[in-house]
């Protein structure tokens, strides 16, 4: 594992110069949310595209408007990308960490070209068919990780906005499933819906306090979101 470098994109560029490309970056969004899917993206950018995407950074540091502007640009410049959606039920069954690692494996496996090297943001990903390296602060070191972060974030945010219409009253479009005072108040008032993760203590407490019920006015779960990429 390496830590954030002072040189922007230096690691990814060095791998390409050493002939170890294509380099795939992989990152997740939604790990700490108590509702909604865990979304993982993998992305391969050609070495000639790195400067064209100089605005890339950790998706959480970018404004929503910048992320939305970068989203189609990344998909246009990417040699390959794949976005994986892991539903709440699978997160509950596997646990967040295991689901996260499994999502990273699926995202890399779903790429339309085989990478020569994989850079993951912070987590070691065992079981990959190619060499890999976890990078702390990887969004600032490798453009491919930053691109994966934006793909995952925008994909998840858009889904949470759609989920807000399917499950009104929780404010999913605003807090995106994370624990906020408004979300906690709605959860206490309405009880959990099928998009909540019962492995999270705040959801479990409410479910147990209401006899484990799922609120009657909560519509059925959204259709399974298909993975996407090229």
Curated annotation (Swiss-Prot):
Domain RNase H type-2 residue range list: 21-212
Binding site for a divalent metal cation: 27-28, 121
Location(s) in or outside the cell: Cytoplasm
Cofactor(s) needed by this chain: Mn(2+); Mg(2+)
Biological processes, Gene Ontology terms: DNA replication, removal of RNA primer; mismatch repair
Main location, first listed in the record: cytoplasm
Gene name, Swiss-Prot/TrEMBL: rnhB
Taxonomic lineage: Bacteria, Bacillati, Actinomycetota, Actinomycetes, Mycobacteriales
Signal peptide per UniProt: none
Keywords: Cytoplasm, Endonuclease, Hydrolase, Manganese, Metal-binding, Nuclease
Stored Gene3D superfamilies: Ribonuclease H-like superfamily/Ribonuclease H
Record-given protein name: Ribonuclease HII
Single GO term (MF): RNA-DNA hybrid ribonuclease activity
Organism field: Mycobacterium avium (strain 104)
Gene Ontology, cellular component aspect: cytoplasm; ribonuclease H2 complex
Family matches, as PROSITE patterns: RNASE_H_2
Family: Belongs to the RNase HII family.
EC number assigned by the record: 3.1.26.4
One Pfam family cited in the UniProt record for this chain: RNase_HII
Free-text function comment from the UniProt entry: Endonuclease that specifically degrades the RNA of RNA-DNA hybrids.
Catalytic activity: Endonucleolytic cleavage to 5'-phosphomonoester
Annotated cofactor note: Manganese or magnesium. Binds 1 divalent metal ion per monomer in the absence of substrate. May bind a second metal ion after substrate binding.
